[in-house]
Structure formats: structure tokens, C-alpha cells
Amino acid sequence: MKLPFEIDLTGKTVAVTGAGGIICGEFAKALGECGANVALLDINYDAAEKIADEIGENAIAIRCNCLDKESIKSAYSTVIEAFGQVDILINGAGGNNPKATCDNEYMFPDTAGVKDFFALEESGLKFVFDLNVTSAFLVTQVFAEGMVKTGGNIINISSMNAYRPLTKIPAYSAAKAGISNFTQWLAVHFAPCNIRCNAIAPGFFVTNQNRGLLYNEDGTPTARTGKILAATPMKKFGEISDLIGCLLWLCSDEASGFVTGTVIPVDGGFSAYSGV
């Protein structure tokens, strides 16, 4: 991996939830290259283990259900046994659910045969809020307790749709807004303990999961891509590597030691664009 710059995290231990995924997996690799001990937590142990193996001897994979406090406590104990303490926590677990996703942007009186707002399922809403907000709450409760005595750094993953809710995903947009608010609350609450808390708010990035929504099989952009880029002043999608600089800056006490309570968009200007 080519880092935009390198910070020295030797002797620091970072716990990353959702580390088997695309974005947080790359985060873990970058942190490992900077010398950190990295604990990769994911309910998909095989995915996390594969990335841990790439990082090397300073990384371990741990199966963790971020909605089960006993599972989180067990994961925390494993990290402490391996590395002694946790200095940085990255709450990266999250996602959406089709049961909380509309088919269309707008509701019309004569709309029929589509999944509109009234067809959204309560179970989908609860799933999305649990996966994004409750997981961050539970993991922080367990992992930050040790930081109260030692100081620490918490980085949450929000989204640009916390600023501008995306039209078809009300639950996910609201959940990420909750993450942004929770980030600010934690920053104030933990300030006397020398614990900083910030969030990164990614914009649109091309990943294996969404590539089929953004590009046709022949490589041409879909209509959705056209709408996204029209609302992105930089007129391009982000690359996962674009997030690494922000991550490393927030991880460095020397570079961002007076920064807490911020939610930083990395979105090519999407959250700033009004369209008029």
C-alpha cells in the first residue's frame, strides 16, 4: 500500500471493528504499515483473518459480534492479552438493509407496485440502527473503559448522508446522523479523560459491493452514477486510499491532538453542494 504520508504508531494498539470489510480492512493495513499492533474484529472471522495475515505478526483477527456485549468483552480480553492495552478504537461496523430501503425517491398518490415509505419494515429499521449505532455504543462501552485511565482515541465512521440524507435509505441516513451526534457527545463526555473522539464521513466510493450499481457490464456509467457525479463538485468517485490520509491524521496525537468532536467529510464536496 502506498501511504499518503506515514506516522509512527509503534507501540500503539488499534482495535478496528468491521475489519473484514473493504474500507476498514484497508484502514487496518495502513495502521499496520505505520507500526501499530492491529486487532481486526469482525463477525466474519475468515475475512478478518485473511487481512491480518497480510499485515503480519503485529495483527490478530478476532471473531466479534458487535451487537453482543459478551462477545465484545471476550474480544477485548483477547486484545489485552495479546497487546496489553487499546490506544485507538475505530468503530467501523455498519451497513444498510433492503427492508429499510425505498424503491423510489418520491412518494406519489398514485404510486403502485413499488416499495414506498409505508412498505418499509420495522425490523429493517431496527436492524440498521442496531448495526450502526447500537454496535458503536456497545463497543465503545467496553473498549473505552480502559482508556479512562490511560487516555485514548476513538474514531467513528459516519457518512456524508448524515449531512444530506440519501433519498432511498432513510434508516441508514438517520443512523449515520446518529453516529455523528454520538461522536460529538463522546468527545465532550470523555474530554477530561484525555480521550479524543472524531468521525470520518466518507462520500461515494467504488467497492466490489456497489460496482454493479455504478457501472454497467460494458463499463459505462449507470444513471445512478450520473446523478452522483452531478452532485459531486470534484466530478469523480473517491478511492479507498483517499480516506487513509484523514485516518492517519486523526490517529496521530502529534498531528491532531487538539482535534475532537469533529465529523470530517471525505466526499469530493458532495455534502457542500446545494445544486443551485
Tell me what each language-model feature is.
Residues 73, 96-126, 145, 168-171:
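Conserved mid-core segment of classical short-chain dehydrogenase/reductases
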Residues 165-173, 185, 213:
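Active-site loop-to-helix junction immediately N-terminal to the catalytic Tyr of the SDR YXXXK motif
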Residues 159:
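Residue(s) in the substrate-gating loop at a strand-loop-helix junction
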Residues 109-137, 155, 179, 234:
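Catalytic Tyr-X3-Lys loop
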Residues 151, 191, 196, 258-260:
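Short, small/polar-rich loop/turn modules that mediate ligand/substrate recognition or access, typified
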Residues 5-39:
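Canonical Rossmann dinucleotide-binding motif of NAD(H)/NADP(H)-dependent dehydrogenases/reductases
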Residues 236-266, 271:
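C-terminal substrate-recognition "lid" of short-chain dehydrogenase/reductases
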Residues 140, 175:
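Active-site helix of classical SDR
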